[in-house]
């Protein structure tokens, strides 16, 4: 018997990113395993209401005020009526939220706990402790996860970061990495349709990502001119958009690199593979990274990886696929890039086996099965007392911080008052149940038979 699961996050299609693809691919594989999945996110321009995606995946686009980078305005309580209605209509058993910076994720967990549902949270990011934004997010996460059933982190570094930020027990935190659809990131076939635009005499370095300071954009604008001045046969392809885009334009003009640096701007995800296949090396200068899915995608296209060692990056790929910078600095990244260029130029490393290795290491079906194990565990071992409202309110009061714990307590009490009010105004037995999408479980044997 499958679970009825709701994924909650501010970030989903049509916006593209690592969290969005994680939610989509995980949901698709959960459906293949026989579970029912709906996604609850905010409206994106004309995407309002209910949308049905491949395999019967239902998406609720809730109209809500967006403040910054597709994050909705935090109100704690105002999303309760609509989220409660959806959870009851879809007969949800498990609420799975994603993203520390997502308002829908935080409020969804709070409302689900109040309704007595099982809750899971996946963290995709690393946060520090030395600026106002990080402190605010950490305090909010501490409140949200006080009564969580299980937390999933995408790397061991992310898990350690989560423990320090929220003081949760390590026993309820699991590590499940991201994955990649290796079929979508096949290396270039010289005899096929994807042909390299650059001359084979050139070494092409690819950079793909959001052009933000935390993604190393300031470092890249200083690294690229240095590498170009040292190697006449090196060219760059930079794909992505963000507030640092103009800095890249200025860098190209000031160093007269118009013929050696292509600035593509935002690239649709279905075109990312085509961009990667134009290169020999992938350069990743991120200042913070919990996992780094793009590294797996680049390696799947047989690119040699040059990267920093921040966060969970060292856990992602084997050493033979990567050249690490000793420090997150311009000089060390230039040195690592020069080393990778010499490896490619001398053909000291055969990268043609990278794709097969990555396809064996990362698979979304494996991620889904491990996630289902967590769902099964919290459903079978947890008791009804865990969701007793008096116990959960008491847990909020036990948190550290003389002001914080009183604020948590006040929010918890108001939440339960609102819960009882909604139960009286809109009784759950008067809410129509949504019909389930007809589905058939896809077994591994069936998939193998189809492939053969």
UniProtKB/Swiss-Prot annotation:
Subunit structure: Component of the phosphatidylinositol N-acetylglucosaminyltransferase (GPI-GlcNAc transferase) complex composed of at least GPI1, GPI2, GPI3, GPI15, GPI19 and ERI1.
Any GO molecular function: phosphatidylinositol N-acetylglucosaminyltransferase activity
EC number: 2.4.1.198
Protein name, as recorded: Phosphatidylinositol N-acetylglucosaminyltransferase GPI3 subunit
Main location class: endoplasmic reticulum
Phenotype when changing residue 297 to D: No transferase activity
Taxonomic source organism: Saccharomyces cerevisiae (strain ATCC 204508 / S288c)
Similarity annotation: Belongs to the glycosyltransferase group 1 family. Glycosyltransferase 4 subfamily.
TM regions (residue ranges): 407-427
SUPFAM superfamilies, per the entry: UDP-Glycosyltransferase/glycogen phosphorylase (SSF53756)
Pathway: Glycolipid biosynthesis; glycosylphosphatidylinositol-anchor biosynthesis
GO BP field: fungal-type cell wall organization; GPI anchor biosynthetic process
Cross-referenced Pfam families: Glycos_transf_1, PIGA
Keywords assigned by UniProt, alphabetized: Endoplasmic reticulum, Glycosyltransferase, GPI-anchor biosynthesis, Membrane, Transferase, Transmembrane, Transmembrane helix
InterPro entries: Glyco_trans_1, PIG-A/GPI3, PIGA_GPI_anchor_biosynthesis
Enzyme class: transferase
Gene: SPT14
């Amino acid at each position: 018997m499958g679970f009825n699961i709701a994924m909650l996050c501010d970030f989903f299609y049509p916006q593209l990113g690592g969290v969005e693809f994680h939610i989509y691919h995980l949901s698709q594989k959960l459906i293949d395993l026989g579970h029912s999945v709906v996604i609850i996110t905010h409206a994106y321009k004309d995407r309002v209401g209910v949308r049905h995606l491949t395999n019967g995946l239902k998406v609720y686009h809730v109209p809500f005020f967006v403040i910054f980078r597709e994050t909705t305005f935090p109100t704690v309580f105002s999303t309760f009526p609509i989220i409660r209605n959806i959870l009851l209509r879809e007969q949800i058993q498990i609420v799975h939220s994603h993203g520390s910076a997502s308002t829908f994720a935080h409020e969804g967990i709070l409302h689900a706990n109040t309704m007595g549902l099982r809750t899971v949270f996946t963290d995709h990011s690393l946060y520090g402790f030395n600026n106002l934004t990080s402190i605010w997010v950490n305090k909010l996460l501490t409140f949200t996860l006080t009564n969580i059933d299980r937390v999933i982190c995408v790397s061991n570094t992310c898990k350690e970061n989560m423990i320090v930020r929220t003081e949760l027990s390590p026993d309820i935190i699991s590590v499940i990495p991201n994955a990649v659809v290796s079929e979508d990131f096949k290396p270039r076939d010289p005899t096929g349709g994807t042909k390299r635009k650059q001359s084979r005499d050139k070494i092409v370095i690819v950079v793909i990502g959001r052009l933000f300071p935390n993604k190393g954009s300031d470092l890249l604008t200083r690294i690229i001119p240095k590498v170009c001045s040292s190697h006449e046969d090196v060219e760059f392809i930079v794909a992505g958009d963000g507030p640092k885009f103009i800095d890249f334009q200025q860098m190209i003009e000031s160093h007269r690199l118009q013929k050696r640096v292509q600035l593509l701007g935002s690239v649709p995800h279905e075109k990312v593979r085509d961009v990667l296949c134009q290169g020999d090396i992938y350069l990743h200068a991120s200042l913070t990274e919990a996992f780094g899915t793009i590294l797996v995608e680049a390696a799947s296209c047989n690119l040699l990886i040059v990267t920093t060692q921040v966060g969970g990056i060292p856990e992602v790929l084997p050493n033979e696929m990567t050249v690490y910078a000793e420090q997150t600095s311009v000089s060390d990244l230039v040195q690592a890039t020069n080393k990778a260029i010499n490896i490619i130029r001398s053909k000291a490393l055969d990268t043609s086996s990278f794709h097969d290795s990555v396809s064996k290491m990362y698979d979304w079906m494996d991620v889904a099965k491990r996630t289902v194990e967590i769902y099964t565990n919290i459903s079978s071992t947890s008791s009804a007392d865990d969701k007793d409202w008096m116990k959960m309110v008491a847990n909020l009061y036990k948190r550290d911080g003389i002001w914080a714990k009183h604020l948590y307590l006040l929010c918890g009490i108001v939440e339960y008052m609102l819960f009882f009010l909604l139960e009286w105004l809109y009784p759950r037995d008067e809410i129509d149940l949504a019909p389930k999408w007809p589905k058939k479980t896809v077994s591994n044997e069936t998939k193998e038979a189809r492939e053969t």
